[in-house]
Amino acid sequence: MSKNLLIELGLEELPAYVVTPSEKQLGERLATFLTENRLSFEDIQTFSTPRRLAVRVSGLADQQTDLTEDFKGPAKKIALDADGNFSKAAQGFVRGKGLTTDAIEFREVKGEEYVYVTKHEAGKPAKEVLLGVTEVLSAMTFPVSMHWANNSFEYIRPVHTLTVLLNDEALELDFLDIHSGRVSRGHRFLGTETTITSADSYEADLRSQFVIADAKERQEMIVEQIKAIEAAQGVQVDIDADLLNEVLNLVEFPTAFMGSFDAKYLDVPEEVLVTSMKNHQRYFVVRDQEGHLMPNFVSVRNGNDQAIENVIKGNEKVLVARLEDGEFFWREDQKLQIADLVAKLTNVTFHEKIGSLAEHMDRTRVIAASLAKEANLSAEEVTAVDRAAQIYKFDLLTGMVGEFDELQGIMGEKYARLAGEDAAVATAIREHYLPDAAGGALPETKVGAVLALADKLDTLLSFFSVGLIPSGSNDPYALRRATQGIVRILDHFGWRIPMDKLVDSLYDLSFDSLTYANKADVMNFIRARVDKMMGKAVPKDIREAVLESSTFVVPEMLAAAEALVKASHTENYKPAVESLSRAFNLAEKADASVQVDPSLFENEQENTLFAAIQGLTLAGSAAQQLEQVFALSPVINDFFDNTMVMAEDQALKNNRLAILSDLVSKAKAIAAFNQLNTK
């Protein structure tokens, strides 16, 4: 008869950002534990609040399934001695399986007999197996962990309670310094310790103590309450998904309310107000029906609506202090001069091993000038790029960015406009940070895109040059994100800038502040980001073939990968790739100094292939270029069918290899076709 299992771990307040992934991890690890221990189940439901992680298993088998395993041992000729008795090898084999030689039988495998034994293991009661379930809790991993009291172990937060129930029976287990029971803790202020009656009564038992254990239910409550406020007040509330997820992991019993602030603060830039409310106070932003910011906010209390007016006043008071700071910095920063702030950047460290921000900007300016030419920017855009590169970090020394660092670039744009800078320059100051997250928004202007590329390129080359190279998951300077941004920007704008040649040219530059180094590592790092950009939807062999193409032009590489994926589902893909692969492999033996000499052709097939290669222009889209190369497949096959490439005559052999080398030099602009798998 099946049963229901409940496991709850009660902890000190968890950081909001770890609650959801930890809840998911607990469910996945328990499912793995049960499967590996042959305990079948129907369903797993997970729960979480800031002070607990829990999981309930429904339809859990009351006993393990029996296990029958066959084990293959040594060959019969080794298992028996000259007298036909079992050898030490056979005896040792069965002993290792906990059996005797009586269990041995011989089975034929591919014409030879081998020792086989069959081991039967009766399933244990679920209750006995579950005594080892604490290994699930011990195996959990967290971004950070801590020690407490005098304990030698560490965990995400101190553990206070452990509840393990099989239906209504409490299992006795020990985890860290806690002995399990059926006592859980209610809401920190509104509830008390409570007894969990059974696995099925878990949510109801906690609800009576003002705890909503199901995160999805808490989220629904928050959204419904906000919608009710919208309807009652005639407003729109920005229900930001990330903020919603954070807030629901800060509360156990949510109650939403709306507060207000003086409308005078609306004269401060909207970004400052939104940052103050959303990022610093975890408030939802309120707008009117036209989308204009209103002097209101919505917050979520961890509790009921008792004395809610006092709660509203307290939150308003805290927010006003933030808004006062914002208003002050907005007013005072406008008194500053951009030139003065830029001059002070010589005293601001970019990194102690690399130099100052001013030096970083100087290098960025040189790189930006080179990129502007490669991207064919207009004269006006080139001028804007140069001016932006001279000043684009000035806002880091403003009071506003010092207080609200999330506004770097955003305030730079606003202050630059107020100072009379060209609109393109001001926009570029904001856009150079983009994209600021995986999948984040990209620069919309060419000037901003070039500045963003230049800034990211110098950052990448500078850190690599001093040996600060990401390893494993460790990337403290966000170089992967910066490089992914480079790849995305190049693809978005369709700039056909050969990255290998560009990086070579940057390494030829000379700066007093820094000498670029570790070029090979930089190129491999960029290739890895292009590989990631192609994504798992592109098979590994296609990604590798494209990454080995002769032209490191990001938009073309990504387009080639897409074209190859589509072509791989067509009938002519396999024969075309196989003929090209054969040509690629043979071309590796060619003498690079040998030029094709048509006077050495001995058959029409040589002449036909050479003419086809000469006429191969690789024009149009990646798909069209691939079609042009694939169209050569019959000509290539005809050449191989009628021509001995590796002829004994050295001149003929070299000439024929040179023909194939010419083919490869053109086709490799798309991909290294011999890296493609057709099996």
From Swiss-Prot:
Gene symbol here is glyS
How does this polypeptide assemble, per the annotation?
Tetramer of two alpha and two beta subunits.
Name the Enzyme Commission number(s) assigned to this protein: 6.1.1.14
Q: What is this protein called?
A: Glycine--tRNA ligase beta subunit
Pfam families per record: DALR_1, tRNA_synt_2f
Species this chain originates from: Streptococcus pyogenes serotype M4 (strain MGAS10750)
Among InterPro entries, the record links this protein to: DALR_anticod-bd, Gly-tRNA-synth_bsu, Gly-tRNA-synth_heterodimer
Indicate the family of this protein.
Belongs to the class-II aminoacyl-tRNA synthetase family.
Mention one GO biological process in which this protein takes part, according to its record. glycyl-tRNA aminoacylation
